[in-house]
Amino acid sequence: MNEQVARKASDTVRPADVVTLAVRERFVSRGGWKLDHALQHFHIKVAGKAAIDLGASTGGFTDCLLQAGAVRVYAIDVGQGQLAWKLRQDPRVGVMERTNARHVTPRHFPEGALPVPLIVVDCSFISLRQILPSAISLLDRAGEIVALIKPQFEAGKAEADRGAGVISDPAVHERVIRELEQFATAELRLLWRGVTQSPLLGPAGNKEFLVHLEKTE
């Protein structure tokens, strides 16, 4: 209050006083809320599991997994220095920077780390078609994948450019999801467990979706 910490519930607040509330965010980034929604929607149990976060960036997905009870998360990102400090210092997090999710293989991981029962994906500027094949090689039999579908990176360049990078046509959303389902089930032999719309829009205002996939063999 008035740039001073109010420590007593009995402190008097006058009409001219300036009151500021300091709200601590639950996750280190908005991505945490997106994954949290998917985990609840698809009834995915995380507690006691090891997981991989492809496209970790600041670490919203990683943070969400840890808060849900993951015992180990390998945070993979092609960039460097983006992961939140609290996650970088967490002994449960394996920081794997400057690692392209498209080309990640079992040799990138320490002995005994693989396979894992759960992989989450939040990648930009690349289609999930180029990420999922690598993810499968890291996944346990009957393991699960939760991936964020970003239509602007799945649709054709002309469609994305037409909306200045924003895909607003529901028909394009439906087509993108349908084509991804066909790819995942027919070519990768994954089970398509379902899809749900993200509770938050992407940075540019794009609608995003989360898909739940399961490995069968």
Map each language-model feature to its residues.
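Short alpha-helix
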Residues: 173-188
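A short glycine-rich, Lys/Arg-flanked "PGG" loop and its adjoining helix->strand segment in the class I
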Residues: 129-146
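Short, glycine-/aromatic-enriched active-site segment of Class I SAM-dependent methyltransferases
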Residues: 151-169
